[in-house]
Amino acid sequence: MLGLGVLYRLYERRLLREVRGGTMPRHIGLILDGNRRYALELGLSDPLEGHRRGADRLEQVLDWLEELEIRIITIYVLSTENLSRPPEELHRLLSLIETKMRSVATDTKIHGKGVRVRAVGQLGLLPVSVQEAIRAAEEATAGYGNFFLNIAVGYGGRQEIADAVQALLLERSREGKGLPEAIAEVTPEAIGKY
């Protein structure tokens, strides 16, 4: 009887062939959701184990993207809504993010592939130690440009829209445009650049 590992690899190859038959995106986004539920469904005693297993898949995801020649990925890790989780759960989750970001900064695969890491979101909402770990990963990979790994932490849909609109209006103001003219340029396409 074939082991699950062999079956999984066969299934993965089949999916890869099917995906390659279509148009490839240049940028994909992954929302990391359901890790707690996954851990509970597996009967794991610690829900954080689901988050750990998800974080450990990062290298495999990067391998897939390299195979598919997709150069940009944004991973949505921690929304502003997640920041209102119970303190103990949040502390453990933030600790996991910090540990993962520190390992990304020194990961030989990340450096070997030339992956540039960049964090987006309201980083000021995070503990200083997590911010420092994120900065370390960004600084360690700043010179790379083969692949781009955006880590969204402290993000929220409404906040992102507000930030993008503010950035657009500020840029138009610097160009000498008045408020009515700048407002006229607020379109989904224009704010999508921010």
Regions found by a protein language model. Name each.
Residues 1-194:
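Flexible, compositionally biased loop and terminal segments
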